[in-house]
Curated annotation (Swiss-Prot):
<feature type="transmembrane region" description="Helical">
    <location>
        <begin position="121"/>
        <end position="141"/>
    </location>
</feature>
<comment type="similarity">
    <text>Belongs to the EamA transporter family.</text>
</comment>
<feature type="transmembrane region" description="Helical">
    <location>
        <begin position="97"/>
        <end position="117"/>
    </location>
</feature>
<feature type="transmembrane region" description="Helical">
    <location>
        <begin position="69"/>
        <end position="89"/>
    </location>
</feature>
<feature type="transmembrane region" description="Helical">
    <location>
        <begin position="7"/>
        <end position="27"/>
    </location>
</feature>
<feature type="domain" description="EamA">
    <location>
        <begin position="14"/>
        <end position="140"/>
    </location>
</feature>
<keyword id="KW-1003">Cell membrane</keyword>
<keyword id="KW-0472">Membrane</keyword>
<dbReference type="GO" id="GO:0005886">
    <property type="term" value="C:plasma membrane"/>
</dbReference>
<protein>
    <recommendedName>
        <fullName>Uncharacterized transporter in cobO 3'region</fullName>
    </recommendedName>
</protein>
<keyword id="KW-0812">Transmembrane</keyword>
<keyword id="KW-0813">Transport</keyword>
<dbReference type="InterPro" id="IPR000620">
    <property type="entry name" value="EamA_dom"/>
</dbReference>
<feature type="transmembrane region" description="Helical">
    <location>
        <begin position="34"/>
        <end position="54"/>
    </location>
</feature>
<keyword id="KW-1133">Transmembrane helix</keyword>
<dbReference type="Pfam" id="PF00892">
    <property type="entry name" value="EamA"/>
</dbReference>
């Protein structure tokens, strides 16, 4: 298995693109919140099978409290994001919803600097600006 973060990030992007297309079709005839529930159940089953099959299960009692807290917060943010995303897909075109959703990249860059102490150079900030501009051009015009 590849240990390259770039490989996994590109794979994530490819699956995220498929997610937008599949989700747009999937929410066409049902409530977007219920569609999110179905998606979540599928993800839970698949990830549980992967963790079990690869022997990656960990004892919950051995996981530090801080880890539980931040994973719970991440889960809540993910759920809110998915609910909003599916509602947006129900109401709008996938080709316009997905780029606007990807403004999360811009927000992550800002939050990373503000809260995680990460550093971005001038070229990085230029890239962030281009992503923001591109997302807005795709979604608004």
């Amino acid at each position: 298995m590849s240990q390259s973060w770039q490989f996994w990030a590109l794979l994530s992007a490819a699956f995220a693109a498929l997610t937008a297309v599949f989700a747009k079709v999937g929410v066409a005839q049902i409530n977007s919140d219920f569609a999110t529930l179905i998606r979540t159940v599928v993800i839970l089953c698949v990830i549980a099978a992967i963790v079990a099959a690869t022997g990656q299960w960990q004892k919950p009692s051995e996981i530090p409290g801080r880890t539980w807290l931040f994973l719970a917060l991440s889960g809540l943010a993910t759920g809110a994001s998915w609910l909003a995303y599916f509602r947006a897909l129900k109401l709008g075109d996938a080709a316009r919803v997905a780029p606007l959703d990807k403004l999360s990249i811009v927000m992550v860059a800002i939050f990373g600097v503000l809260f995680l102490g990460e550093k971005l150079n001038l070229m990085n900030w230029l890239g962030v600006a281009f992503i923001a501009a591109g997302a807005l051009l795709l979604a608004v015009f």
